[in-house]
């Protein structure tokens, strides 16, 4: 069976009034043709693309999304903070240093210093996020039902400054608003990421995963605020589609929200009687890329997962398998 080429959608006028009257003969780029999605990769493979290239592109499909700092004090409810960093920039004279302004403070600190502060605090557990594919990220919700979404959530505690910094950048890009999404920030992060790429070894899978996530969010954010992305194939496809239907960032007609916010039914919901997430547990700014994190149903899933994570995720299971050199045996 021949696969339909998804690169372009063409509106043809077939009679009658409606949207097609004003869009007759207009070619609109398909979201599957403009973004590196799985469907597009299959199409490219059928057209003769080298298999190794397809595998390399498939590797970037998994994305860390809705990153929050996880903090918990014994006897108190946990807190998941996506608003702990209110400003971020790369130091001009030392482009491997990321400076941040923390919520409630006015002075800049380096991520190196912030990392040391966090790892010495008993309440700091690490970062939580969900692992989604590009097409599962649907702007206002996620394409994974709650009963399955909890198996996509993970807790990651960085053991080095670079991985910690990448988590902070992910969290900041998701929560940034229109006023903070500046060309200057985009250029700074692009230069920083080029330096980071040189520090990713073939076995450092987690670092590569975080790095690829930053690339997706950076290019998507640029597209949302009408800047040309550095890499157009790294724009999340549903953000492209919503942008075509509604060019004004940060707002959307009710019909678009309805399309992207439809539920999955009770069969795939969390167990009956699951309590909602208490107020104040998830603290999230009104960002351009964190719509689902502000949704009460997503927060409910996060809270349920946190309370039951030892049952959902076996103790010794890691997000990525790691390989270490075996000790040399001297004879």
UniProtKB/Swiss-Prot annotation:
The keyword Lipoprotein does not apply. It is found in: Virion; Virion tegument; Host cytoplasm; Host Golgi apparatus. It holds the Pfam family Herpes_UL7. Signal peptide: none annotated. InterPro entries: Herpes_UL7. It comes from the Viruses. Keywords: Host cytoplasm, Host Golgi apparatus, Virion, Virion tegument. One of its GO terms (cellular component) is host cell Golgi apparatus. The keyword Flavoprotein does not apply. Plays a critical role in cytoplasmic virus egress. Participates in the final step of tegumentation and envelope acquisition within the host cytoplasm. Belongs to the herpesviridae cytoplasmic envelopment protein 1 family. Interacts with protein ORF7; this interaction localizes protein ORF53 to the host trans-Golgi network (TGN). This is Cytoplasmic envelopment protein 1. It comes from Varicella-zoster virus (strain Dumas). The lineage of its organism: Viruses, Duplodnaviria, Heunggongvirae, Peploviricota, Herviviricetes.
């Amino acid at each position: 069976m021949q696969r339909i080429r998804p690169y372009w959608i063409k509106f043809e006028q077939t009679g009658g009034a409606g949207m097609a009257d004003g869009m007759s003969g207009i070619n609109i780029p398909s979201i599957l043709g403009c973004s590196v999605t799985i469907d597009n990769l299959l199409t490219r493979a059928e057209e003769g693309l080298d298999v190794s290239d397809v595998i390399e592109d498939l590797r970037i499909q998994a994305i860390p999304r809705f990153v929050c700092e996880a903090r918990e004090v014994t006897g108190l409810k946990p807190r998941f903070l996506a608003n702990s960093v209110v400003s971020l920039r790369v130091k001009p004279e030392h482009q491997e240093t990321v400076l941040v302004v923390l919520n409630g403070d006015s002075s800049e600190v380096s991520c190196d210093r912030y990392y040391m502060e966090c790892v010495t605090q008993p309440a700091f557990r690490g970062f939580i996020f969900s692992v989604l594919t590009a097409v599962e990220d649907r702007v206002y919700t996620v394409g994974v039902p709650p009963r399955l979404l909890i198996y996509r959530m993970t807790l990651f505690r960085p053991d080095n400054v670079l991985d910690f910094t990448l988590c902070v950048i992910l969290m900041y890009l998701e929560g940034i608003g229109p006023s903070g999404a500046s060309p200057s920030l985009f250029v700074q992060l692009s230069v920083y990421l080029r330096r980071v790429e040189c520090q990713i070894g073939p076995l450092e899978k987690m670092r590569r995963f975080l790095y690829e996530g930053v690339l997706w969010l950076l290019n998507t954010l640029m597209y949302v605020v009408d800047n040309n992305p550095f890499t157009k194939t790294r724009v999340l496809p549903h953000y492209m589609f919503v942008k075509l239907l509604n060019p004004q960032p940060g707002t959307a007609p009710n019909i678009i929200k309805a399309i992207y916010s439809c539920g999955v039914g009770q069969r795939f919901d969390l167990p009956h009687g699951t309590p909602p997430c208490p107020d104040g547990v998830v603290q999230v700014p009104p960002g351009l890329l964190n719509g689902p994190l502000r949704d009460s149903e997503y927060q409910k899933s996060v809270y349920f997962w946190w309370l039951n994570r030892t049952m959902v995720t076996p103790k010794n299971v890691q997000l990525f398998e790691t390989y270490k050199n075996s000790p040399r045996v001297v004879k």
